[in-house]
């Protein structure tokens, strides 16, 4: 009994530790001195509303009086402490799931990161820059308008950006939205106002880990039929040193059945491991109206020195999905074939649910996808003027049998 307890403790100690940094934030205009409480995740417009500095921009013509906000630089700041257990780990990373958009990140007054893309995650190692006690994290957001106008001025021609409401924004004909890796609709569209945001729009946290960790797992599906699913688990592992022996296993979470396993040596840095496996007579995933959208839960474990260094669980629908584009009497076909069955696509164009994306709750996401399913839709197109949606959005689509046609941004 004592041996079991010790083994469990060792396994727990090896797993990455996480601290969310969602409390104690404050913000201010960079050129002014007054600080105000801030909400993270959030954006500057919602923080200004919460502090009664501006009114609701969606009421009457309030939007017109708020175009000064995107011409200002903004600073967000908080403090945090890590436990001795986290400080004792070999590696400590600061991870931003989303920064909107041009941002310099400082830890204890040292610049550690420059961000320029709201669509991606940002990660940086911070262990050498941490203090044993209180640490100060500061983010300086540059005005996207001030950053991008020089790019517009430098060109002898103009990019097309017909929906950019530059005149409403007070920058005349300078449609700078095309220069930023940022949601296009923030600059105005034919269906919505111009509200160009800045802020920590997705979660931020610190993770501490030893030896190696799983960066990503993708279950590739080369061949799926009702008799057999041939699958490949593509596992990306980050190691902080050369490791002679590590074990990677994939199990079916519900039954605990081991589906694939491999002993590998890891090089320092990124390692990509492929684990082929198969499932006989799989329960297939079907779109809404054609059958049950069954999901398998796969767990991937990484073991180093007989300790679980990391684990990753993901729900996956097993299906064969193809675009059929073959010659016919009118030209070429263009339709979706799911598990060998032609699908009559019924759906809608999905645009972001709010100009201020952090306000969208999990409940709103679920209601939206469930409403689509209840309306007999089986596909949503993610419009290219918005953002790549949250993981929750795609998980709900999987759960309710909704196919996704994903635009690039």
What residue spans do the PLM features occupy?
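Aromatic-lined substrate-binding rim segments of carbohydrate-active enzymes
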Residues: 379-409
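Secreted/periplasmic carbohydrate-active enzymes, especially glycoside hydrolases
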Residues: 1-380, 399
């Amino acid at each position: 009994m004592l041996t079991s307890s010790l083994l469990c403790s060792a396994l727990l100690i090896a797993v990455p530790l996480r601290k969310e940094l969602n409390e104690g934030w404050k913000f201010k205009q960079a050129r002014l001195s007054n600080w105000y409480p801030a909400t993270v995740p959030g954006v500057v417009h919602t923080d200004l509303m919460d502090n009664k500095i501006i009114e609701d921009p969606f009421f009457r013509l309030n939007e017109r009086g708020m175009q000064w906000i995107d011409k200002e630089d903004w600073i967000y700041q908080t403090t945090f402490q890590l436990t001795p257990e986290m400080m004792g780990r070999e590696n400590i990373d600061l991870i931003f799931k989303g920064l909107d958009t041009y941002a310099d990140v400082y830890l204890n007054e040292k610049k550690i990161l420059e961000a320029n893309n709201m669509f991606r995650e940002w990660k940086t190692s911070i262990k050498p820059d941490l203090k044993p006690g209180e640490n100060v994290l500061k983010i300086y957001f540059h005005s996207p308008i001030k950053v991008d106008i020089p790019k517009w001025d430098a060109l002898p021609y103009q990019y097309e950006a017909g929906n950019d409401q530059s005149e409403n924004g007070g920058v005349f004909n300078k449609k700078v939205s095309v220069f930023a890796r940022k949601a296009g609709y923030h600059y105005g569209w034919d269906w919505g106002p111009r509200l160009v945001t800045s802020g920590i729009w997705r979660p931020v946290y610190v993770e501490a880990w030893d030896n190696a960790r799983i960066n990503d797992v993708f279950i590739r599906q080369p061949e799926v039929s009702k008799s057999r699913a041939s699958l490949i688990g593509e596992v990306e592992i980050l190691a902080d040193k050369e490791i002679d022996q590590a074990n990677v296993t994939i199990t079916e979470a519900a039954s605990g059945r081991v589906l694939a396993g491999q002993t590998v040596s890891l090089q320092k840095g990124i390692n990509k491991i492929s684990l082929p496996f198969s499932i006989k007579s799989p329960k297939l995933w079907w779109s809404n109206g054609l059958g049950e959208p069954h999901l398998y839960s796969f767990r991937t474990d990484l073991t180093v020195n007989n300790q679980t260094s990391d684990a990753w669980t993901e729900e996956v629908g097993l299906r064969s999905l193809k675009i059929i584009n073959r010659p016919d009497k009118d030209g070429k076909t263009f339709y979706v074939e799911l598990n060998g069955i032609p699908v009559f696509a019924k759906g809608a164009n999905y645009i972001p649910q709010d100009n201020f994306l952090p306000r969208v709750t999990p409940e709103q996401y679920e209601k939206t996808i469930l409403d689509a399913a209840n309306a007999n839709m089986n596909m949503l197109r993610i419009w290219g003027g918005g953002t790549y949606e949250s993981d929750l959005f795609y998980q709900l689509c999987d759960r309710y049998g909704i196919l996704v046609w994903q635009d690039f941004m």
